[in-house]
Design a protein with these regions (language model features):
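Short acidic-glycine loop/turn motifs at beta-strand connectors
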Residues: 139-145
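Conserved donor-nucleotide/metal-binding helix-loop-beta segment in metal-dependent transferases, i.e.
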Residues: 111-134
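Conserved N-terminal catalytic core of the sugar/cofactor nucleotidyltransferase
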Residues: 7, 13, 20-21, 25-103, ...
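Catalytic-core segments of class I nucleotidyltransferases/pyrophosphorylases
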Residues: 145-233
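Extended, small-residue-rich solenoid/repeat segments and analogous flexible loops
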Residues: 199-275
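Structural signal for interior beta-strand "rungs" in well-ordered beta-sheet cores
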Residues: 242-332
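The conserved acidic donor/metal-binding loop of glycosyltransferases
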Residues: 106-109
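Short internal beta-strands
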Residues: 47-51, 126, 293, 309
């Protein structure tokens, strides 16, 4: 979680990307909960690797510790002082690297329903994609085992893209290999990468297999985050999840589902939806809103929004359709 999420600015100027709500729940909260479902067993510890305390401060730590507590797990916080790559980030948490573990990048969302092969030394989670040349992919042998990781292949290797989630039967083995990477200064563009540790494990004959997820959703920028919100709302609706709080106040309002409407939201002379998420305590008046995310404690008036993303504590009175407004902004 140590990155700054620059492609999602202005929203990540005040809130780290993994804590931005999608369909009413922070990205990292959804991710960890969905991983827990696949594991199908109690989680003992959740370790979070954060960057500069000036950006990932006490409020971030509090939210993450609450997430660990919800899972009945111990929460641990580690700091990556410099952005020196995924391998370096993982080794920042080396005190927690023992036994079975999942390592995941915190800014992605999944839907997965597969049986985790815990007999393998590692399971690399993958998604079948249409343009494999744009991703890092896995190469399989005839036994459905991963024998190579290939970054953005120019010639077809496979269409199974690595999504940044890994299960290790004993993550201590990865730790030992990454320690070798750091000790020998094996870098790419000045960064230490998890792939070099994985490749060393493969060279030692360890068994890697793919775990195929059903859906893989990105939150890299505003447009894809809005799209991810749409997809997540659709999934939650199909699963029968209740997404409209009982405390919502409506006056001449219409909600076109699927939508997430948080606690104590006020809707007056307004149509909301489909595919809209509204955070708690937000007031929306005289507006039509679809395909958009609006966070908490904001006031929206006289708006006609489509494909919009509005942060927390925003006052907005206007008619730009596809606007993106960060926290604590006033546009009247």
């Amino acid at each position: 979680m140590a990155g700054r999420g620059s492609r999602l600015r202005p929203h990540t100027l005040t809130v780290p990307k993994p804590l931005i709500p999608v369909a009413g729940k922070p990205i990292v909260h959804r991710l960890v909960s969905d991983i827990a479902k696949v594991l199908g067993e109690p989680i003992e510890e959740v370790a979070f690797i954060l960057g500069d305390p000036a950006f990932f401060g006490d409020d971030v730590v509090e939210s993450l510790m609450e997430l660990a507590d919800e899972l009945g797990a111990k929460g641990s916080i580690y700091r990556q002082d410099k952005p020196l790559g995924t391998g370096h980030a993982i080794m920042s948490a080396k005190d927690s690297l023992s036994g079975p573990a999942v390592i995941a990048y915190a800014d992605t969302l999944i839907r997965a329903d597969f049986d985790l092969d815990k007999s393998a030394d590692s399971v690399i989670w993958v998604k079948q994609v249409e343009r494999p040349e744009a991703y890092g992919v896995v190469k399989l042998n005839g036994n459905n085992e991963i024998v190579e990781l290939v970054e953005k292949p120019k010639e077809f290797v496979s269409d199974l893209a690595v999504i940044g989630i890994y299960y290790f039967k004993d993550v201590g083995v990865l730790k030992n290999q990454l320690q070798h990477v750091l000790d020998n200064d094996i870098t790419h563009g000045g960064e230490y990468q998890i792939n070099d540790g994985i490749k060393r494990m493969m060279q030692k004959g360890m068994k890697f297999v793919p775990g195929k997820v059903d859906e893989w959703m990105d939150c890299g920028n505003k447009n894809v985050t809005v799209e991810t919100n749409q997809r997540m709302l659709s999934f939650l609706e199909k699963e029968g999840e209740s997404m409209i709080a009982d405390s919502v106040q409506q006056e001449n309002a219409n909600i076109v589902e699927p939508c997430f409407i948080g606690e104590n939201v006020v809707l007056k002379n307004t149509t909301v939806g489909p595919f809209v998420s509204v955070g708690a305590n937000t007031v929306i008046e005289n507006s039509t809103i679809k395909n958009s995310l609006i966070q908490s404690d904001s006031k929206i008036s006289n708006a006609n929004l489509d494909n919009a993303m509005i942060g927390n504590h925003v006052v907005y009175n206007g008619n730009f359709e596809t606007i993106s407004i960060g926290d604590y902004s006033v546009l009247e």
